[in-house]
Structures are given as C-alpha cells and as structure tokens.
A protein has these predicted regions:
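A conserved mid-protein helix/loop that constitutes part of the nucleotide-sugar donor-binding site
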Residues: 14-22, 178-201, 218-224, 313
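Conserved acidic donor-binding segment of nucleotide-sugar-dependent glycosyltransferases
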Residues: 290-312, 322-326
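A short, active-site helix/loop in glycosyltransferases that binds the activated sugar's phosphate group
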Residues: 122-154, 159-163
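Aromatic "clamp/platform" in nucleotide-sugar-dependent glycosyltransferases that forms part
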Residues: 240, 259
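Short hydrophobic beta-strand element within catalytic cores of glycosyltransferases
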Residues: 276-279, 286-290
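Nucleotide-activated donor-binding/catalytic signature segment of Leloir-type glycosyltransferases, i.e.
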Residues: 224-239
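N-terminal strand-loop element at the rim of the active site
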Residues: 6-14, 18-68, 145-148
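Short His-centered aromatic/hydrophobic patch
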Residues: 70-71, 89-95, 110
Length: 362
C-alpha cells in the first residue's frame, strides 16, 4: 500500500485540524494509506480516529519536536516509515528543514497563506491562487531564478458531498425576519467587529434581520462591549457551536467577514447546506466566489457576494441586497451548492492529489 505521511505540531481546532481529515479522505479515495504524526491532545485526533486507512502516531509535543529535530533517529520504526513513504506532507513551515532530509519528496501545505520559510521547501501546495501568486512574487524579489524556486501547485480543499443535494425550504412566512449567521474564533483576523458595525448600519436603516454570531475566543468581551455601546439589538453572540449544520438549517444567509481567509472551509460548508453567502475579498473566497469575476452578477452565479475586506458599509450593502431580493438570494443558494459540488468535491481533491504525488520525483 502506498503511504503518505503528514507531520504537524499543531494542536488547535481550525484549519489544519480539519484539513488533516480532508487529506485522509482524499488519500483513501486515491488508494493511499495516510499516516499522521502529531502531538498528543491535538484537536484533529478524534476525527482522524474514524477515518479508514489512516494510521495515527502521537507524541507529547516536546518529544515530537525533539524527534523532528533529530529526524526520528531515536524512533527507528517511524524513521524507516518516513524514509520509505511515497511522500511527506509538512503542515507547518518551520518543520521543512528537518523533514526535507528524508528521501521521499516533501510538500509544504501552505495553510496560512503567509510567506515564512517557503523558500526552504521543494514543493508547496497552496490553497488559493492569491497565495501562490504572492509566493512567486516573493521568490522573484529575492532574486530566485525559476529553476531555483519551489514547485508551486494550487490544491484547494475538497468537500464531502451529501448523498442528495440539500435545498433550503422556501420561506412559508413572508413576514419572517431573515436570519444571518457567522461563525469562527473571536480573533481580530476573523473580522467580526466589521459585522457588528454592519449590523448597526442595518438597524439604523430599519432593515429587518437577526444576526447570530457563533464562536469563542479572546475578543468575546470586546465584541459584547461593541454591541452594547452601539445599541445594536439585531445581533447576538451565541457561543461555540459543535454542530454548525443545525445552525445552517435554520439560517437564510451565511456571512464570512474575515480580514484573512486562506481558504474558507466554512464557506463551502455553508454553500453545500443551501445558503447564499457573503464573504470578504480574501484569498479563498475570491477563488470560490470570484471564478467568473468579482461583479455582483458574476459572484451571485457562484453562490453569493464579495465585498472589500474591512469595509462594514460595503458588508451592510451586500447584506441588504440579499435580504431585500429574495429571488437573487434563492438563485445564489442553488448556484452555490452546485458550484461547490462541481469544482470542490473530495473526489476532485483526490484526483488532483494523486496526480501531484504520481509525478513527484524522489
């Protein structure tokens, strides 16, 4: 059995944890075994334990860092597996130097879209075209000739498609107030302060809506103070939701107001759930919604609207458009689920990943 090994020191919930499960599923579809080396207590462990053809090796974080630094010389069984693997997927840029000394081709998975340590990798997998373009400009600015640059490939995440397409039931009550939801960690880069400001603008304009913000994090108290100081009554902090699918089922619109969004897994999940979406013009959303251009007509045909990041007024305008235009809202919902199914399925990711691994040179 062909084995691909993923290595990470990340323990937090979020992008890397979710991506590891996605890679396990894609590799399984493509006929590979996936071995994941990660810290004890990592958020990804529970989900990975249920994936077929996935083998888990966990260590206390300090020991894992030591083993990576010493290239597992004191753990000969894993050292042998790393030497014989079809490929090594490195999920933290700072680990590239140590892991690149093994024989198999290594791929840095650029989850963050940032540029740190990219030049040390032989191969880089980017989640978006914007991230890839930034990296190539950075390599050129450093004077790296094309032959010296890492091989850069765009490999977006894939989504497990439902057995049948999900369609939101049409609103039976024409007077029902539209419900907008957003979710994520309460940190500055997620842009939820902009959503609160946009909620205040909608309230001032007497645009009927309720906004539910799911999440937790260091800025929770700050967001509540902002809501109180603005006197906003149409937005509520709901805490962390373990099962967002039930939240999607009760919502009418999904909003992703991030200042940084390397891909936006939650955006695709909302679209598959049958929600029209509004997202900031960040890396992932621009690829997902902007495939045919960034005009409202073009993005609505892919599932929603884009607006300039960090612009609450533009966000409020986009929300207002979907709230008032139920026909466009419904059409965007149908277009979005179709767009994800056609272009971002797990099968598409598996095919692309298999092609990358098959042509990679040892």
């Amino acid at each position: 059995v062909k084995t691909v090994i993923s290595v990470t020191t990340d323990r937090q919930p979020g992008g890397i944890a979710t991506a590891l499960t996605g890679y396990s599923r894609a590799l399984n579809i493509a006929g590979y075994q996936h071995m994941v080396i990660l810290p004890e207590g990592a958020s990804a462990l529970a989900a990975l334990a249920n994936e077929p053809n996935t083998e888990i090796k966990s260590f206390p974080l300090g020991w894992l860092k030591f083993h990576i630094l010493t290239r597992f010389i004191f753990c000969p069984s894993i050292r042998a597996r790393l030497s014989d693997a079809r490929a090594i997927l490195v999920h933290n840029a700072r680990l590239v130097t140590s892991l690149s000394r093994f024989t198999p081709p290594h791929f840095l998975v650029n989850h963050s879209g940032k540029l740190r340590n990219l030049g040390k990798a032989d191969n880089i997998l980017f989640l978006s075209s914007a991230a890839q373009n930034r990296a190539k400009r950075a390599f050129e600015a450093l004077g790296m000739a094309a032959a010296e640059q890492p091989k850069c490939t765009i490999l977006p995440h894939g989504f497990l498609l439902p057995a049948t397409a999900r369609k939101k039931a049409a609103k039976q009550d024409k007077d029902k107030i539209p419900k907008i939801i957003a979710a994520g960690r309460f940190v500055e880069k997620k842009g939820f302060a902009d959503l609160i400001d946009a909620a205040a603008l909608l309230q001032h304009q007497n645009i009927p809506c309720t906004i539910e913000l799911y999440g937790a994090g260091p800025l929770e108290d700050s967001y509540q103070r902002q809501i109180d100081q603005l006197g906003v009554q149409n937005i509520t902090l709901k805490g962390w939701a373990e099962n967002l699918s039930s939240c999607f089922a009760k919502a009418d619109i999904f909003c992703l107001p991030s200042h940084e969004e390397p891909f936006g897994l939650i955006l695709g999940e909302a679209m598959l759930a049958g929600l029209p979406v509004i997202a900031s013009m960040t890396d992932g959303p621009c690829d997902i919604l902007g495939a045919g251009g960034t005009s409202p007509e073009a993005t609505l045909s892919c599932g929603g609207l884009l607006y300039p990041q960090g612009a609450p007024e533009a966000l409020a305008e986009a929300l207002c458009l979907l709230i008032k235009d139920e026909e466009s809202c419904a059409a965007a919902a149908l277009a979005g689920s179709k767009h994800i199914a056609e272009h971002y399925s797990l099968e598409k990711q598996a095919q692309a990943l298999d092609a990358i691994l098959t042509t990679a040179k040892r």
